[in-house]
Amino acid sequence: MVGHTESDVPPTMAVKIFSAGVAACVADIITFPLDTAKVRLQVGSAIQGECLISSAIRYKGVLGTIITLAKTEGPVKLYSGLPAGLQRQISFASLRIGLYDTVQEFFTTGKEASLGSKISAGLMTGGVAVFIGQPTEVVKVRLQAQSHLHGPKPRYTGTYNAYRIIATTEGLTGLWKGTTPNLTRNVIINCTELVTYDLMKEALVKNKLLADDVPCHFVSAVVAGFCTTVLSSPVDVVKTRFVNSSPGQYTSVPNCAMMMLTREGPSAFFKGFVPSFLRLGSWNIIMFVCFEQLKQELMKSRHTMDCAT
């Protein structure tokens, strides 16, 4: 991304991929309870197994959902699905974020990056990352959504148990369930998030409003998080419902969206908007700040080692 000073050592592709993966994992660990609350709110009155989640317990708002989960199922439940979440970031975020600059440079061929090249880079890296990381997304959402209260025995006892059961009962295609809505969602997220961050950071630095440092990264990340949440929320809700559904509950992604619209109205597509924004906003801040700092420190360390030898 933009903003390297002449004294900086340009980060290599390996450094970018590694930094993106580590930064995304740090952000996931800190913000995971918000993501779990978002999933529970999005699932809402969807049927899980043979029991209506809403008939067992109701969640009110982000904080209310987190408190209710902690009280009724234990604080550990807020981190249910975290191992799959971290696996997802290692296989997903490291590619979509770490390869963004490299792919963008490929499209520009030495020229100044245009909006088209930024969008193209976001589309390509996001699409590839989704396909590779989809099984981890399916397992993460299933574990976050299942409740241990007022219903049948939980479908999964842990991360690897979930992988095994899904592959056994639904086939390998079950691990890629919801790829279409997730691809749509993450193409939107990747383009909006990275392009908005890139443009905002570039504008702040070029107009000398902020230096290319933590405050600049913070502001750019907040703006990127808000824009991304607005555009991706409807697709995110449909994706969560479809991925978490029992076999045969929905015949297709459009069928899932249509049933949501007819049963719950248009507002259903924005369920969990507040936790989504809190999650994306805070996740973006932590991830981008860590990402930028890691890149700089790793390249400084490498430069120091090269000079020493």
UniProtKB/Swiss-Prot annotation:
It catalyses: H(+)(in) = H(+)(out). One of its GO terms (biological process) is proton transmembrane transport. The chain crosses the membrane at residues 11-32, 78-100, 119-135, 181-197, 215-234, 269-291. This is Mitochondrial brown fat uncoupling protein 1. InterPro entries: Mit_carrier (IPR002067), Mito_Metabolite_Transporter (IPR050391), Mitochondrial_sb/sol_carrier (IPR018108), Mt_carrier_dom_sf (IPR023395). Residues 2-10, 101-118, 198-214, 292-309 are mitochondrial intermembrane. One of its GO terms (molecular function) is oxidative phosphorylation uncoupler activity. Keywords: Ion channel, Ion transport, Membrane, Mitochondrion, Mitochondrion inner membrane, Oxidation, Repeat, Transmembrane, Transmembrane helix, Transport. It comes from the Eukaryota. SUPFAM superfamilies: Mitochondrial carrier. Pfam families: Mito_carr.
